[in-house]
Regions:
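Structural signal for hydrophobic packing residues in well-ordered secondary-structure cores
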Residues: 47, 91, 112-115, 119-122, ...
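Acidic, metal/ion-coordinating pockets
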Residues: 1-201, 242-250, 254, 395
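Short, glycine-/Ser/Thr-/acidic-enriched flexible segments
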Residues: 2, 91-92, 132-133, 173-175, ...
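A short C-terminal boundary segment appended to hydrolase-like catalytic domains
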Residues: 186-280, 412-418
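Residues that mark the start of a beta-strand
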Residues: 82-83, 262, 371
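Pocket-edge structural micro-motifs
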Residues: 56, 88, 170, 265-267, ...
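Acidic/histidine-rich
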Residues: 137-141, 147, 244-283, 334-355
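Feature captures C-terminal
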Residues: 276-418
Length: 418
């Protein structure tokens, strides 16, 4: 349920469930898109009409009970009497799940207990893993599992990889491949004799080019939902990924206000397009800001903030084509601030060195702690390691950046709420 897609956004994932029903799935597990980009009430309703079972062993209500729609595993017996244990595990992001009123636990603890539980009943064990390639390899090395159907890191095994007698399979992303696993079992002894898996390009399948009536129906339904008018702009709001515009500055200021911060900070590349004068709909806002990215407030030392400001000014950072972290745009673009004035050094030819940084009109103090309203993707991975290691972070969930954008447009002096 990637809310980048208008059907997922408009239906809160219910359209995705309809498509899974049509594809005749028996078992699924959830990933972080379902778990931490949907509000709890939407996740609790996501599978109301599912024609399949949802397996996720390590997700709980805060009280410690599993949600009604989830089971840890399923023992599936074929017509030949072969019992297969299907186990569902999802990646744990405790801080994010906690913000959404869930409790997520270490998937391996539950894997161990389930393997012990099904040992005497199951002839074959299959893990539906939304844990990523490295964790799948770890499970293969350390546990007695026959097949791991992988996800999360969007890797591709065109042929299944056998590791420590565990078959690792994964089909990348976006439905570009469909997986086929073949298991050969001795009917008498119920022993697994052979296993093989491959990923097949969906464009090679006969039905690939045929329009699916369910998708067409969902597209029409979503188009109607997303046509809801939000504001009427009295003037256009253009964007430029490499220069500050009133629109991008407004967004930085909106993050500052939303997070109750001293400073707002956001990259211009999060706004994929500008907005024209006139009526702006939900669909327009989703189109220009489709990212499943959350606002967050950070406590940052002046020293670290200065380092981030310097790094953000580098051409290689502004031109960086970002993949992942919730970002669905093209490039990072220029870093835009509210409450920050960057004064470059006057050395001839200088583009990077700074004479001073003013925070709300006063020189930045290296030892002072500042509150920064920004976006969660800066706290992940390699973009800004200085921010990813901060201990004092507050994420705002389930609100997404486009919710901040919507509020900003409604209160914009050159707009009228509809």
């Amino acid at each position: 349920v990637d809310r980048f897609h208008s059907i997922s956004e408009a239906t809160n994932g219910l359209g995705n469930t309809k498509l899974l029903n049509e594809a005749l799935y028996d078992y699924v597990t959830i990933g972080n898109n379902e778990g931490i980009t949907l509000a709890k009430e939407h996740l609790n309703r996501l599978y109301d009409d599912a024609g399949f079972e949802v397996l996720v062993a390590n997700l709980f209500e805060k009280e410690g009970v599993r949600p009604e729609w989830a089971k840890p595993y399923k023992l599936h017996t074929t017509t030949d009497g072969i019992t297969i244990a299907f186990i569902g595990l999802t990646v744990a992001y405790p801080e994010f799940y906690h913000m959404l009123d869930w409790h997520i636990e270490d998937p391996l603890i539950h894997l161990e207990s389930i393997l012990e539980e099904v040992r005497d009943e199951a002839h074959i064990t299959v893990v539906l893993s939304h844990l990523g390639k490295s964790m799948d390899e770890y499970m293969a090395e350390h546990y007695d599992i026959d097949v791991i159907l992988g996800a999360h890191t969007h890797h591709l095994f065109e042929r299944g990889v056998l590791m420590n007698n565990t078959l690792l399979c994964c089909c990348e992303k976006w439905g570009r491949y469909v997986g086929h696993v073949q298991l050969t079992v001795d009917k008498e002894t119920k022993r697994l004799l052979k296993k093989d898996g491959r990923a097949i390009k969906t464009e090679r399948l006969g039905a690939y080019s045929k329009p699916l009536s369910t998708i067409e129906m969902l597209q029409e339904e979503s188009k109607h939902i997303m046509a809801e008018p939000v504001v009427h702009l009295k003037e256009s709001l253009p964007v430029d990924w490499f220069h500050e515009t009133p629109f991008s500055h407004m967004l930085a200021n909106a993050l500052k206000t939303w997070c109750g911060a001293e400073i707002g900070m956001v990259n211009a590349g999060v706004l994929l397009e500008g907005l024209e004068e006139g009526v702006v709909t939900r669909g327009d806002i989703h189109r220009i800001c489709p990212h499943p990215i959350n606002p967050c407030a950070l406590k940052v030392s002046g020293k670290t903030l200065r380092e981030v400001i310097l790094k953000a000014r580098r051409p290689n950072m502004e031109n960086l084509e970002v993949k992942g972290f919730g970002f669905r745009g093209k490039v990072m673009g220029k870093m835009i601030y509210a409450g920050v004035e960057v004064i470059p050094d006057t050395i001839p030819g200088n583009k990077l060195l700074l004479e001073d940084v003013l925070i709300n009109g006063e020189s930045l103090e290296l030892d002072r702690i500042y509150t920064v309203g920004t976006i969660d993707m800066f706290t992940f991975g390699y973009l800004y390691p200085e921010l990813s290691t901060l201990s004092d972070k507050q994420y705002y969930m389930p609100e997404l950046l486009r919710d901040v954008l919507t509020d900003m447009l409604i209160t914009h002096t050159s707009s009228v709420k509809l």
